[in-house]
Swiss-Prot record:
<dbReference type="GO" id="GO:0045672">
    <property type="term" value="P:positive regulation of osteoclast differentiation"/>
</dbReference>
<keyword id="KW-0863">Zinc-finger</keyword>
<dbReference type="GO" id="GO:0003682">
    <property type="term" value="F:chromatin binding"/>
</dbReference>
<feature type="modified residue" description="Asymmetric dimethylarginine">
    <location>
        <position position="594"/>
    </location>
</feature>
<feature type="compositionally biased region" description="Low complexity">
    <location>
        <begin position="849"/>
        <end position="870"/>
    </location>
</feature>
<dbReference type="GO" id="GO:0045600">
    <property type="term" value="P:positive regulation of fat cell differentiation"/>
</dbReference>
<dbReference type="GO" id="GO:0000122">
    <property type="term" value="P:negative regulation of transcription by RNA polymerase II"/>
</dbReference>
<feature type="zinc finger region" description="PHD-type; atypical">
    <location>
        <begin position="1332"/>
        <end position="1369"/>
    </location>
</feature>
<feature type="region of interest" description="Disordered">
    <location>
        <begin position="1103"/>
        <end position="1175"/>
    </location>
</feature>
<dbReference type="InterPro" id="IPR028020">
    <property type="entry name" value="ASX_DEUBAD_dom"/>
</dbReference>
<dbReference type="GO" id="GO:0008270">
    <property type="term" value="F:zinc ion binding"/>
</dbReference>
<keyword id="KW-0597">Phosphoprotein</keyword>
<keyword id="KW-0862">Zinc</keyword>
<feature type="domain" description="DEUBAD">
    <location>
        <begin position="229"/>
        <end position="338"/>
    </location>
</feature>
<keyword id="KW-0833">Ubl conjugation pathway</keyword>
<feature type="modified residue" description="Phosphoserine">
    <location>
        <position position="1121"/>
    </location>
</feature>
<dbReference type="GO" id="GO:0003007">
    <property type="term" value="P:heart morphogenesis"/>
</dbReference>
Amino acid sequence: MREKGRRKKGRTWAEAAKTVLEKYPNTPMSHKEILQVIQREGLKEIRSGTSPLACLNAMLHTNSRGEEGIFYKVPGRMGVYTLKKDVPDGVKELSECSEESSDGQSDSHSSDNSSSSDGGSNKEGRKSRWKRKVSSRLSHPPSPPSGCPSPTIPASKVISPSQKHSKKALKQALKQQQQKKKQQQCRPSMSISNQHLSLKTVKAASDSVPAKPGQMKRTKCADIDVETPDSILVNTNLRALINKHTFSVLPGDCQQRLLLLLPEVDRQVGPDGLMKLNGSALNNEFFTSAAQGWKERLSEGEFTPEMQVRIRQEIEKEKKVELWKEQFFENYYGQSSGLSLEDSQKLTASSSDPKAKKTPAEQPKSILPSEASPVRIVPVVPQSECKEEAVQIPSPSQKEENQDEARPDSKSPEPVLASASNTNELITMKPIKSPKDEGLLEQKPVACAEQESEKENHVTTTSRNNKSENQEALAISPSKSKNAGLQKPIIKPVAEASPLNPDMKMPPATVTDQIQESLKRKSSLTDEEATSSWEKRPRITENRQHQQPFQVSPQPFLNRGDRVQVRKVPPLKIPVSRISPMLFSTSQVSPRARFPISITSPYRTGARTLADIKAKAQLVEAQKAAAAAAAAAAAAASVGGTIPGPGPGGGQSPREGGERKIAGGGSAGSDPVSTNGKGPTLELAGTGSRGGTRELLPCGPQPETNMPGQAQPPGISGAQLQQTSSVPTGLASSGACTSVPLPAHIEISNSEKPNLHKATATAASPCHLQDPRSCRLEKALSPTGPPLISGASTVYFVADGTVEPKAGSNKNAPKPSALAKTTAPAPLDMTSSPVTTASLEKLPVPQISGTATSTGSAPSSSTLPAASSLKTPGTSANMNGPISRTSSSIPANNPLVTQLLQGKDVPLEQILPKPLTKIEMKTVPLTTKEEKGIGIFPGISVMESSSREEVNGRQAHLAIPQLGKPLQSKQLSQVPRPVFTAKDRKDPCIDTHQYREGLSKTTQDQLFQTLIQRAQRQSVLSFVPPSQFNFAHSGFHLEDISTSQKFMLGFAGRRTSKPAMAGHYLLNISTYGRGTENIKRTHSVNPDDRFCLSSPTEALRMGHADYKNTTGEISSKEDESDEDRVGDEQEPISVKEEPWASQSSGRHPHHGEASSTNDCLASKNGKTEAPVSEQTTLGQENYIFSRGQASDEKSLPRDFIPAAHKQMTHAVRGKTVCSSPELFNSTALSLPADSPTHQPLLLPPLQTPKLYGSPTQIGPSYRGMINVSTSSDMDHNSAIPGSQVSSNVGDVMSFSVTVTTIPASQAMNPSSHGQTIPVQTFPDDNSIEDTPSKCYCRLKAMIMCKGCGAFCHDDCIGPSKLCVSCLVVR
C-alpha cells in the first residue's frame, strides 16, 4: 500500500493521463474527462491548492506538441487527446497538426514549454518537434487571434481590422524608414555597425543592400531590405504584417513552404494532404517572440551579407571540429531526450517521415551532409530579380538544391523565402527569420562541438532556406539540421522576415549564406538547448540572449549611458538615483563624483518613488531656473559649488538617510536631510538645493518625512517641499525636525527660492511680516509650531543661506524686510552679515559669490550661516539651517562657488580653509551687522532677548562658526571656504572684537545654554548635550579664549560645527554620512553643541533644540541637530526669548564652566580638542586649522570623503587637537596629540559631562565633534573656530565622525588664522570608511575627471567634467 501511495504521490500528470488513455485505448478524451478518471481512480494524488485541470491541460498541451510528446490532440475537436501510439502514422500527422491547430491558441505556450521539458523519448519526435518549433516560430506571424481554431484558415476576403492594421503598420514603417534614411542617407547599415556587427557588416549592408524603404508598391515586390538594420522591417510590427489574411494572399506553394517552418501544432493537414494554417499559428506568443527575435536580429545586422559571411566562416571553422561536435551533438539534440547520436542521425536522415514536417526536416538533413560544403549554393539566384521573381528565384535555387538533396525539405525554407518576398515580405521574413535565428543561436555557442552540431542544424534549416546551406548542415548532422531547421525557424519567423527580403535583393547565395550562418549560429545554441526544450521558446530565449548580448547590450548600453549621463549630470535624473548607490559606494573616493552624486543622490536614499523622481526632476528644473538667474554663477555653482555641497551632501545623503533611518528619530531626521542633500546636490546645477540640503540633511529627522517632501514637491519645491514636509514630520518628531525643513528650504533655496518662499512663507511669512529681526525671531519662534516645520526650516534656511534666506533671507529677499536680516538670497544673507564689517563687505562679494560659497554657498550655507550667525541670534536658528546649508548652499547659488567656477577672485584659500577664518571675518561683520541692525535676524531677535550685544557677539560667533561650519561642510567641496578665508583674514581682529563684544551676551547665551544643556544633559544626549556643549563651548570659549573663544562659543563654533556637519558633512552625510550616521546620531548632542557653538543664537537654538530634542532627538544627525537647533532653536526662539535668556544664563555659567572645562568643552563638543588646543596651542591650533582648513576645504571637495577624512586626520594631527581619537579615526587620533588638553576630546563623553548636564551622553554624541573641536579650540584667534571645530567635529563626527569633526575644527581654526593646515581637518577616516563606501549615483556611469583623471559618476562629476576637488581648485 505504501509503495502504491508513494507511486501515486510521485506520479506526474503525464503518467496519470497516459495511464488513463491506456486504460481506454481507443477513446479520445478531453482533459476534463481525463481528470475525472484520474480523480475517480485516484491515479494521482492531487494536492490542495493546485488546480488539477489547469495542470493537466497544460501538460496535455505540452506533450501533444512535439513528436516526442506522448499524446495526440485529435484534429477536429477541442482539447481532445489520445495516445500517440494509438494513432496510425498517417493519421498521426494530420491529427497532430489539427489538434495543435485546435489547441493552437492556448497550446502554443504550454506545449512549447512542455515539449522542451518533456524531452521526447524518440529522436524522431524530437526532430519533428524542432522542425515544428522552427516553423512555428518562423511562420507565427502575429495574426489576429482568429476566432476559429478550425484547422483550415480560409483566406478571408473581407478586410479585417488586422489587415488594416498591417497596412497601417507598413505605412508607418515606411515613413519611419524614410525619415531614418534621410538621416543616414546612404548608410543604411550604420545601425549595424553600432551593434556588435563589424563595420564590415555595415559596408556590406550598404553595398549589397540598397536598403530602400521602398513604397508599398515596391514592397510587394522583392525590394524590401531584409538584411540591414536600416530595413523598414525593423520599424514594422511583423505581427501586424504577418497574419492569416496576408498569409492567405501568398501563392499556395509559398504557403506550404512557409507552413513547414511552423511547429506541427500550428499547422494542420487537410484531407487533401495540404497543410493549412492553424487558427492561432500566427497569433501566439511563440510566433510573437519569433517575430520579435527576428526583428532584433535584423536590427543588429545579423542578416547583412557581411555578417552572413562571417557566420559562414565561423561555421567552416567549426567544421574542423565537426567529428568532435558530432560526438557531442547528442548532448544538445539527443542526449537530454535519451536519443543517441545515431538515432538522431537516423531520424534526420530518414526523409520518409510520414509527417510533412518531419520529411522536410529530415530531407534537408540527409541532403545537408551530402552537400555540406556548398553552403553558398543559393547565391546562384540573382538578387536583382523582382521580388516576385526573387520569391520564385529562391524557390528555384532551393528547388535545385533540394533536388540535389531532398527537394521538398531544403526547398521549403528557400521557397518560403522566395514566396515570402514574392507574395509578402512578411512571409519571407518568417523563413529567413528561422535561419537567422538559428544563425544567431549558432553564433552564441562557441564550443566546437556545439558549433559543429549547430552547423548541421543551421545547415539543415538553411537547406530549407537554401540548398547549399542544407548541404553543409547535412554534412554535419541531419538530426541537428532538422532540429536547427525546426527550432531556428520558429525563432526566426520575424527575425528572418527582414533578411529574407534583403536576401531576395541580394543574390540568393547571399540569402542562403545569411540564413546558413545565422541558422548555424542559432543551431549551436539550439543544439545545446534542443535537449532541454524542443519548443520554439527555448530557441527564442537563446536567440534573445544572444542577440541582446550582441546587439542590445554592447551599444545601446554605451549610447544610453553616454547620452543620459551627460545630460543627467546637471539635472537630477532618475537614472542617477538608480546608479548612485553602486557608483558612489566606491567609498566616494572622488569628491568630484560626489557633487554630481549629490545631484542625483538626494533622493537615492530612502524611497526612489515616482514622486521622488518627479520631485527631483522638478527640483532640478527649479534649480536650473535659479541657476539661469545666475547663469554663470549657477553653472559654476552647479559644477563647482555643487561639487562641494552636492558631492558630500548628495553622496552622503543616501547614506546619511540610511544611517539616520537606522538611528531612529534622529536617524529619520538625517534621512530627509540626506534626501535633501541629494536634492541640493541635485541642485548642483541649482544652488540652494545643494547647500540647503546638505545642511539640512542632518536635520531631517525622518527619512520618511524627507521622502514625503520629495514626493510632495511637484516642482522646484520638490526638494524644498521634501525638506519642508520633512520638517513638519521631523519637527513634530523632534526638535531635529526643524532641521529637516531646513534642508528642504536649503535645497530649494537656490533653485526653488519661490517655492521655498512658499514653504518658508508658511513658517517664515509671519516673520516676514515682522521686522527682519522680529521675523527671524518669530521664525525661530514660529518654527516651534507648525511654522517650525516650514517656518523653522525656512528660518534656518534663511540663516543658512540661499534657502534659508527663503525663509529668512530668501523670504526676506522676496520681502525686503527679511532681506535686511538675511539678505534675501544666500549672497544677501551673507552680505547682510558681512556687510556690517569690512571683512563682511569683502565677504559679501565672496560670500555672495565666494563667501557664500565658502561659508555656505553664498549665504545659503556658510555665508548665510555666517551672515546668519552674524545676524544671529535669530539667524542662529537660521544659522543652524544655514550652517547645514552652508555646504549645500555653497554649491548652487554660492557666489563663492560661482566665482570659483567663473575663475574669479575666489582664492582656493577662501574656498577651503578660509571659511573658518571667514567665520571670524563674519564675526566682525556680525558686530557691524548688529550695529546696522541687519545682522540681527530672528536669531538676533532671539538674542535680543538676551541682549543685542550678546546677539552681536553671538552673531559674530555664529557667523564665524557658521562660516566654519559651512566651511566644514564645504570642506568636502565648498567654494565658500575662500569666502571664509577672505573674511577670516580680515576678521581675525574683528572676530576678537566681536567676541569680546558678544562676550557678555554670548556669555549670557552660553549661560542659558549651560542651563539648558544641564537640563538637556539630564534629558540625555539627544540634543541637550549638543546644545549644552555649544553653550558651554561658547561660554567656555568666551571666557577662556576671550574673543576667539567667545567667538567660538558664540555659536560661531556651533554654527561652524554644524556647517561642517550640515554643510560640509551634510554633504558627507548624504554621501558617506550614513556610515557616520550612527556616530552622528551618537553625537547627536554633539552636533547640537556644535551647532550651539556655531553661534550664540545657534547655541541657544542648539540648546533649545537639544533641550527639545534631548529626549527624542539626540540621535538625530548632527545636521539634524543643527537643523533642530535651527528649528528647535527657532522653536526656542519662538519660545526663544526665554530659552535664550535661560540659555544665556545657562550658557554663562556654562561659559564659566566651559572656561574651567575648556578641555571638557572641547572634548564634549569634540571641541575639547579645540578649546584645549586653544588654551595650550591656540595659536598652533589656529595655524594648523588654518592650513588644515585650507587644505581641508580644498581636498574635501576634491576627495570629499576620502580626502576629507585624510585631511581631517592630517589637519587634526597638524592641529594636534584635531579631535579625540575616541570618536573617529584620524581626527580623534589627531586630538590625542593635544590629548592632555584635549583629554575631554579624547574622552568626549567625560568632558561632555563636564560641559553638559549629561556629559557622558554628550561625549559619545560628540565624538565626532571632538575631533573637530580640538581644531576649533586650537583656533585661539577665534573661539568660534574652535567652537566651530568642536561643533563641526561633532557634526563631522556625527556624520562622518572624523571628517566632519576636522572640518568644523578647521573651519574654526582658520577663522582666526590663515588656513595653513594643508591636511584637511576631515581626515574622517571613519567618515571615509563609513560613507565613501557607498556612492549614491548607483545608476550613473563612471566618467573621468578631465582635471585629475579621477573616476566618478557622471552625475557627480557634472557638466564641467571636473571632479569636486578640481572644481574647487578652479
